[in-house]
């Protein structure tokens, strides 16, 4: 299964491009799933989703099916066999998950004298959309689709979402470590010694279930069959900055980038001075992008002059090279180079394309390395061989970070 995350600058046409990519896959005879958190009217504006008129599974209503992430075939008036569109209802997802958790925590709430909240009292909290998408990605990863296209928010929020499974799993391991669960037979004794109730078994079981589900999503994000497609409208300095920021974030968190789409490109050679100048700025920006992104394809999508109203509009908008699911451009892996024989050190090589020294910060804490690049930060567990070493320095050259480690004689096995 191929997975393509579509993101980019705000207002650049991400949803239109994601829908067109999904449609192109369905036209090739693939089984395609399109995931989006965009409102129903925004999806309907792409010409594929039929809004309330989209048929739903028998016995299910539109709200329930969307909130639960049940696939809604985009057929009927749209007439696109093989294409399934799921619009996530993050509000319904939040209420359902909150009530489920509250039910499981009933004993603890009774102990505190709390009055449980009812469904009608709940309103969606910030961040609910991200968790709804994580649950939808887990379900998609367990499906049998040939292609999954995910319509993500603008690039900063998108990269934060892709990094979320790893971050949440780290929090769970720190707050509810498996070692404490293993000592559950001693929990009554520990509770008496501490003078406070110990966490209930259901809490550890819930944490274990969350960790397993997050691991599935993390595996999907880190899969070699997963890539990111960036969408931007050239011509403004802001678009160029956003793409450079995206490159930094994807270099640190992944997945690999497979294509940059320059959207809404005007025809060249216009007799109108204003349009000619705007087209010239677009072409200059595209040239800069191709130089900056190296071997990553930069495909142009022409300005249609109107919003797409039906699938045929998307067919005309997206040509074969832009609509294909090309393989992501290979990136160097994170490797440990053994240079003890020459320099007495081990070197951890971390590719960070687009990174510059004044935006880079490194901090080692115990068995982890905190890497900050621009607005992004990732906490990396050290490979086991480096945990017995001390950091002696680091350098950034040509988009690759090299961190030098000196083996600690007191910890390093003798004879090695």
Where are these regions (language model features)?
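Walker A/P-loop NTP-binding active-site region of P-loop NTPases
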Residues: 5-88, 152-170
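Conserved nucleotide-binding/hydrolysis micro-motifs of P-loop NTPases
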Residues: 39-42, 90-94, 154-157, 177, ...
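C-terminal lobe/tail of nucleotide-utilizing enzymes
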Residues: 55, 186, 214-357, 366-370, ...
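Conserved P-loop NTPase-based nucleic-acid remodeling module centered on helicase motor cores
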Residues: 78-80, 85-112, 120
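Short, charged/polar, Gly/Pro-enriched secondary-structure boundary elements
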Residues: 92, 169, 409-413
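Phosphate/Mg2+-binding loops and adjacent switch elements
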Residues: 106-244
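Structural motif
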Residues: 342, 363-365, 397-399
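Short, surface-exposed loop/turn motifs with a glycine/proline- and acidic-biased composition
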Residues: 386-402
